């Protein structure tokens, strides 16, 4: 098994507390409203804290698919949220687990800087596929942008 680590950073004009609330605390209701492809987010195991498994149901290419997302850690005081993809379409056959360590920081003019460390654990001697990595980054960037756009369009939230 190999472990490969990647880091990424995004910026937004949305304040960290507001963004964190949408991405973590109210994710089950905000994400389906903000991200067109995601139809629902539901808890399948747990109480919403670490260890909880959520099922994100989405439409991709006209088909209904899902991703299983396990909450690893929540640090509300420091705007931290760690989770893993543990099942569904988010895991290619060569990947055992994909973990995300995310944190929001104060950015310029009251905005936010979002930092994420992604750890990919492969099965056996498999290497991560560069195209899969690029596609995953593009999905992550589009997700972040969709939440940002929703919050900008809904200042009352």
Curated annotation (Swiss-Prot):
Ca(2+) binds at residues 32, 35, 38. Its EC number is 3.1.27.-. Trans-zeatin 1 binds at residues 8, 83. Its main location: cytoplasm. The keyword Nuclease applies. Pfam families: Bet_v_1. GO terms for cellular component: cytosol; nucleus. Keywords: Allergen, Calcium, Cytoplasm, Hydrolase, Metal-binding, Nuclease, Pathogenesis-related protein, Plant defense. Trans-zeatin 3 binds at residues 69, 81. It is an enzyme of class 3 (hydrolase). PANTHER family: OS08G0374000 PROTEIN-RELATED, STRESS-INDUCED PROTEIN SAM22. Belongs to the BetVI family. This is Class 10 plant pathogenesis-related protein 2E.
């Amino acid at each position: 098994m190999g472990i490969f680590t990647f880091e990424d950073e995004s910026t937004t004009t949305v304040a960290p507390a507001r963004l964190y609330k949408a991405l973590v605390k109210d994710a089950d209701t905000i994400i389906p409203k903000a991200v067109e492809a995601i139809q629902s987010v539901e808890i399948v195991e747990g109480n919403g804290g670490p260890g909880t498994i959520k099922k994100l149901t989405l439409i991709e290419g006209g088909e209904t698919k899902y991703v299983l997302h396990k909450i690893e850690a929540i640090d509300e005081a420091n705007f931290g949220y760690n989770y893993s993809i543990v099942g569904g379409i988010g895991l290619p056959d060569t990947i055992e687990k994909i973990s995300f360590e995310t944190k929001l920081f104060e950015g310029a003019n009251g905005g936010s800087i979002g930092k994420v460390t992604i750890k990919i654990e492969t099965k056996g001697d498999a290497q991560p596929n560069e195209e899969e990595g690029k596609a995953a980054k593009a999905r992550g960037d589009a997700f972040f942008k969709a939440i940002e756009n929703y919050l900008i369009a809904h200042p009352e939230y």
